[in-house]
Amino acid sequence: MSILARPAAPSPRPNALANWLLLVAVLVFAIVVVGGITRLTESGLSITEWKPVRGIVPPLNQAEWLAEFENYKRIPQYAAFNLHMTLEGFKAIYFWEYMHRLLARGIGAVLAGVMIVAWWKRAIPAGYGWRMIGIFALGGLQGAIGWWMVYSGLSVRTEVSHIRLATHLIAALLIFSALVWTVLDLRRLARDPDARPARPTALAIAAVLILAVQIMLGAFVAGLRAGYAFATWPKMGDEWFPAGGWNVAQGLANLHENPIVVQFVHRWWAWAAAIAALAVARAARKRGAVGPVHAVATLIVVQIALGIATLLTGVDIAVAVAHQAVAVLLLAALLWAGHGLDKPKVS
């Protein structure tokens, strides 16, 4: 039979499909990391147009670079902060935004390719086709959210909306989570052809939501530059909460608009996220899991240390990027631990 021939009957290959989707998940992890670098280097507004196809090709000569630079000069961010910027400086920030968009296109192409080949080879197990279509649709929506975020910084603001930034990050992690959970389901199916997809327990759902809130708060911290408000730990300056830090006029909007309050909540909500993740790890251990338990525990320690280091270094870019990267790895470990909670306990 030709390698291009379509099988006459379904030929599910859950392990092979899991490997390919794991690759896509790794690419999503990479784009989240690059997105963090893009934000921290103030590169996100360097490309002021949305060209899904033509935008694949970067400027190739001096005239094209100058045209792109002129586009950037028209937005408020340039006038407010970058009047001194040279063309070489512009190329540096353009690089990260371009790589971020190129990775996004690459992820879409790889996922589409995997879906098409798996469909043609009839290798998608029953019940997984619509799930993969849903993940691909989320990817398309994420592209629109990305442009919606960038657009917020092109006319009046000198930076993107931190609310839209958080939406963009959470959408990326929703895609990442769907991929990781699907990979785990497919691995289970490969071990046992009669296995059903795992059902997330209330504990696992609660822990993931608590961690998602903490990651969202981290996006608020980045978007509001709240990490620069206080570079001390555990106190904020000389106080646990600075006098006058809560703006009475803002009311509950302090929780997402006030840099001091956002940093404070992000500091202490971290402990709720850690406790919830450890509760899942403990439950997983009772069901015989070892790898995910160690992964969750180790990553919690590393993540807390990186969070403190991010503050104490005055938001050093390398440390802050590592902090964001480990947040995604912790989410993956939490999903791994939570995936097996529908199994009976080991006596």
Curated annotation (Swiss-Prot):
Highest taxon of the lineage: Bacteria
Record bears the keyword Iron: yes
Subunit structure: Interacts with CtaB.
Record's bilayer topology term: Multi-pass membrane protein
Protein name (record): Heme A synthase
Native source organism of the sequence: Rhizorhabdus wittichii (strain DSM 6014 / CCUG 31198 / JCM 15750 / NBRC 105917 / EY 4224 / RW1)
Cofactor(s) annotated in UniProt: heme b
Gene transcribed to yield this protein: ctaA
Catalytic activity: Fe(II)-heme o + 2 A + H2O = Fe(II)-heme a + 2 AH2
Pfam families: COX15-CtaA
Family the UniProt entry places it in: Belongs to the COX15/CtaA family. Type 2 subfamily.
GO function term, MF aspect, one: oxidoreductase activity, acting on NAD(P)H, heme protein as acceptor
Keywords: Cell membrane, Heme biosynthesis, Iron, Membrane, Metal-binding, Oxidoreductase, Transmembrane, Transmembrane helix
HAMAP family hit by this protein: HemeA_synth_type2 (MF_01665)
Enzyme class label: oxidoreductase
Record EC number: 1.17.99.9
Binding site for heme: 266, 323
